């Protein structure tokens, strides 16, 4: 049986101390075995929360590019190198503000 996923995208909210409080609260909870809880904190906090035992960590985005002059973007290889298993792809805000399309997302 596949696990149910409960995910929360923190977007560009919470300073580090606020994020720590929420993260620690989520880590202190008990979750059913058939549920995977995933959080997508701001990118600046990804590595600091990536030692979670009960909560999985996701990037809020992943670049279609493997490397190059793409300031502020993260490749799948970079995210994988810090053991991230999840990334949000095709979010409505990325589509609206960055003009991402189904076609551009196929390359990710």
Please tell me what each predicted stretch does.
Residues 1-74, 81-84:
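Conserved N-terminal beta1-alpha1 strand-loop-helix module at the mouth
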Residues 85, 90:
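Short acidic/polar active-site loop segments enriched in Thr and Asp
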Residues 106-108:
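Conserved small/polar residues in nucleotide/adenosyl-binding loops
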Residues 13-15, 92-93, 97:
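Short, glycine-rich nucleotide/cofactor-binding loops
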Residues 67-69, 94-101:
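Glycine/threonine-rich flexible loop motifs
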Residues 75-76, 80, 96-99:
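Extended, folded domain segments that form the structural surfaces/walls around functional sites
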